[in-house]
């Protein structure tokens, strides 16, 4: 049994398979998941697990070069946007409109669906390198 890091076998496998610039998405329970993209559904009920809890665990285990968010989060979910900026202080941040964000999710290696039920609580994590 693993002692550290992500215990979910699907998430651990996706993280281990990422190459430089590959992307994964951590999403609220309402984000549409495109056909053909791996869905890792963690949602058990509204709010559980939370977007921020899942983001923290994944971020602790992943080299992140860039973060993409929907620009709508700035005004519509101030708390989540602030927490993302506090948790992810090193990567570059990019904001795009929500429609562009959804287009970008089509290229993700996986989308991790949380139980989060607040607006625009979604992030695309772009893999960096550890060297």
Swiss-Prot record:
<comment type="similarity">
    <text>Belongs to the RbsD / FucU family. RbsD subfamily.</text>
</comment>
<feature type="binding site">
    <location>
        <position position="98"/>
    </location>
    <ligand>
        <name>substrate</name>
    </ligand>
</feature>
<protein>
    <recommendedName>
        <fullName>D-ribose pyranase</fullName>
        <ecNumber>5.4.99.62</ecNumber>
    </recommendedName>
</protein>
<keyword id="KW-0963">Cytoplasm</keyword>
<dbReference type="InterPro" id="IPR007721">
    <property type="entry name" value="RbsD_FucU"/>
</dbReference>
<keyword id="KW-0413">Isomerase</keyword>
<dbReference type="GO" id="GO:0062193">
    <property type="term" value="F:D-ribose pyranase activity"/>
</dbReference>
<keyword id="KW-0119">Carbohydrate metabolism</keyword>
<dbReference type="GO" id="GO:0016872">
    <property type="term" value="F:intramolecular lyase activity"/>
</dbReference>
<comment type="subunit">
    <text>Homodecamer.</text>
</comment>
<dbReference type="InterPro" id="IPR023750">
    <property type="entry name" value="RbsD-like_sf"/>
</dbReference>
<dbReference type="InterPro" id="IPR023064">
    <property type="entry name" value="D-ribose_pyranase"/>
</dbReference>
<comment type="pathway">
    <text>Carbohydrate metabolism; D-ribose degradation; D-ribose 5-phosphate from beta-D-ribopyranose: step 1/2.</text>
</comment>
<dbReference type="Pfam" id="PF05025">
    <property type="entry name" value="RbsD_FucU"/>
</dbReference>
<dbReference type="GO" id="GO:0005829">
    <property type="term" value="C:cytosol"/>
</dbReference>
<comment type="function">
    <text>Catalyzes the interconversion of beta-pyran and beta-furan forms of D-ribose.</text>
</comment>
<feature type="active site" description="Proton donor">
    <location>
        <position position="20"/>
    </location>
</feature>
<dbReference type="GO" id="GO:0048029">
    <property type="term" value="F:monosaccharide binding"/>
</dbReference>
<feature type="binding site">
    <location>
        <begin position="120"/>
        <end position="122"/>
    </location>
    <ligand>
        <name>substrate</name>
    </ligand>
</feature>
<feature type="binding site">
    <location>
        <position position="28"/>
    </location>
    <ligand>
        <name>substrate</name>
    </ligand>
</feature>
<dbReference type="GO" id="GO:0019303">
    <property type="term" value="P:D-ribose catabolic process"/>
</dbReference>
